[in-house]
């Protein structure tokens, strides 16, 4: 967990576990230690006394001490407190103030966590419990020891610690598990329950480590990151076994929202069902995400909105499409420069318009309901919405779909190309070449 000479910040609450950890690391030697403490201010004078106790302990040991005072927002106090502590620890690591943050979680904490998550219906990811080492640099050296062993260590050395009165109350679910359910199950079913649950976490972590590599590979093949969203082909999901499809959906959710906070089995299952539905459309919700089905695509992301735009494009030049990283490039070309290829190639591949047929009042805007025109190759005018449906273009791609007009006439649209009445032909002298580019 530690390299010799590593800078290790120890998160110390003042309780038995963290006090034991600090003393043990001092005894171990060879590390550059510092002490971190978070005061949530929830217990008034007692919270301040905890902070003073930890500060004095650090001073006696000659260690740097960093105190963070936080005010918790509304909601689950236990959960918000944990998030505040982890945020502080991650900030210390990100700022380069330490190489590792050591926390005092024990095997007893592990057992409580696994049992709690099992009761809530967690899969193997949740049953993996508390990780001994995280990628961010948080380590838990006491994770193989039970709480009773920790307290015995402190009593033998006559080392004092602080007792948090809220740990004895019944208002928090974890306390009810710690003081009620877990001892009862151990007494009536399995005396070695703490060890059994810890082994369950170890087994689940190994499973998750294997699947992480497999899902990394599948994600690269099946998931596409877009602007504020992740896209999945429904056929890709349907080709997988249900177990793998669920894991891939979890990864897509994590990519789209940054974490899996608040996401449960039911959310994942609804996304899988949406992908498998016979209809090519539908919608469901995941905490923090809107999930839409359109034809053979799923989109997981923030809700997309249509943002109307109307621009005078640069000729020549590139005009960026608002809300996207795409742009429309326009270039005037003399006929002599384009005569080496048949005209139909230029019209279909490049989107060339006859400059003389244009009145010069060009406007670049997004598609609107009711828009219609006659693309080259069609015998009559068609609504662009119908073209979208024929080409199976997802609804979210249509919102900023570019249309080039000249006066009241649509002369070009993405994918469907030049209008028949404005397309360049053999008689054209100067042509307007259109193209789409990605703007970095």
UniProtKB/Swiss-Prot annotation:
It is found in: Cytoplasm. SUPFAM superfamilies: Adenine nucleotide alpha hydrolases-like, MesJ substrate recognition domain-like, PheT/TilS domain. It holds the Pfam family TilS_C. GO terms for cellular component: cytoplasm. The keyword Ribonucleoprotein does not apply. ATP binds at residues 13-18. InterPro entries: Lysidine-tRNA-synth_C, Rossmann-like_a/b/a_fold, TilS/TtcA_N, tRNA_Ile_lys_synt, tRNA_Ile_lys_synt_N, tRNA_Ile_lys_synt_subst-bd. GO terms for biological process: tRNA modification. The keyword Ligase applies. Keywords: ATP-binding, Cytoplasm, Ligase, Nucleotide-binding, tRNA processing. It is an enzyme of class 6 (ligase). It catalyses: cytidine(34) in tRNA(Ile2) + L-lysine + ATP = lysidine(34) in tRNA(Ile2) + AMP + diphosphate + H(+). It comes from the Bacteria. Its EC number is 6.3.4.19. SMART domains: TilS_C. GO terms for molecular function: ATP binding; tRNA(Ile)-lysidine synthase activity. Belongs to the tRNA(Ile)-lysidine synthase family. HAMAP family: tRNA_Ile_lys_synt. Ligates lysine onto the cytidine present at position 34 of the AUA codon-specific tRNA(Ile) that contains the anticodon CAU, in an ATP-dependent manner. Cytidine is converted to lysidine, thus changing the amino acid specificity of the tRNA from methionine to isoleucine. The N-terminal region contains the highly conserved SGGXDS motif, predicted to be a P-loop motif involved in ATP binding. This is tRNA(Ile)-lysidine synthase. The gene is tilS.
């Amino acid at each position: 967990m530690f390299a010799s000479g590593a800078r290790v910040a120890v998160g110390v609450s003042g309780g038995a576990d963290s006090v034991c950890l600090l003393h043990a690391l001092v005894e171990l030697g060879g590390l550059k230690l510092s002490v971190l403490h978070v005061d949530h201010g929830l217990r008034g004078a007692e919270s301040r006394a905890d902070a003073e106790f930890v500060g004095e302990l650090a001073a006696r040991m000659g260690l740097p001490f960093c105190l963070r005072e936080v005010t918790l927002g509304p909601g689950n106090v236990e959960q918000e407190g944990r998030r505040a502590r982890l945020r502080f620890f991650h900030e210390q690591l990100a700022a380069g103030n330490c190489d590792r943050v050591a926390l005092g979680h024990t095997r007893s904490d592990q057992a409580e966590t696994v049992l709690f998550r099992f009761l809530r219906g967690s899969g193997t990811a949740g049953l993996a419990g508390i990780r001994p080492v995280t990628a961010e640099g948080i380590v838990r050296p006491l994770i193989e020891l039970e709480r009773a062993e920790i307290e015995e260590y402190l009593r033998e050395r006559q080392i004092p610690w602080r007792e948090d009165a809220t740990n004895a109350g019944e208002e928090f679910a974890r306390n009810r598990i710690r003081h009620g359910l877990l001892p009862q199950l151990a007494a009536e079913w399995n005396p070695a329950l703490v060890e059994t649950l810890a082994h369950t976490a170890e087994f689940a972590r190994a499973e998750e480590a294997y699947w992480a590599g497999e899902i990394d590979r599948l994600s690269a093949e099946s998931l596409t990151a877009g602007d504020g969203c992740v896209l999945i082909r429904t056929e890709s999901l349907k080709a997988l076994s249900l177990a793998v499809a669920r894991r891939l959906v979890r990864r897509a959710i994590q990519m789209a929202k940054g974490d899996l906070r608040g996401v449960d089995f039911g959310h994942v299952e609804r996304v899988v069902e949406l992908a498998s539905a016979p209809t090519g459309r539908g919608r469901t919700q995941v905490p923090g995400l809107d999930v839409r089905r359109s034809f053979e695509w799923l989109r997981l992301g923030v809700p997309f909105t249509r943002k109307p735009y109307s621009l005078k494009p640069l000729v020549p030049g590139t005009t960026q499409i608002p809300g996207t990283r795409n742009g429309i490039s326009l270039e005037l070309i003399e006929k002599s420069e384009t005569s080496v290829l048949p005209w139909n190639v230029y019209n279909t591949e490049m989107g060339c318009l006859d400059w003389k047929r244009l009145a010069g009042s060009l406007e670049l805007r997004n598609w609107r309901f009711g828009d219609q025109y006659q693309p080259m190759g069609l015998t009559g005018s068609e609504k662009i919405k119908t073209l979208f449906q024929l080409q199976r273009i997802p609804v979210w791609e249509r919102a900023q779909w570019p249309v080039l007009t000249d006066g009241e006439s649509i002369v070009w649209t993405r994918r469907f190309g030049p209008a028949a009445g404005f397309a360049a032909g053999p008689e054209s002298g100067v042509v307007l070449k259109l193209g789409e580019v990605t703007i970095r």
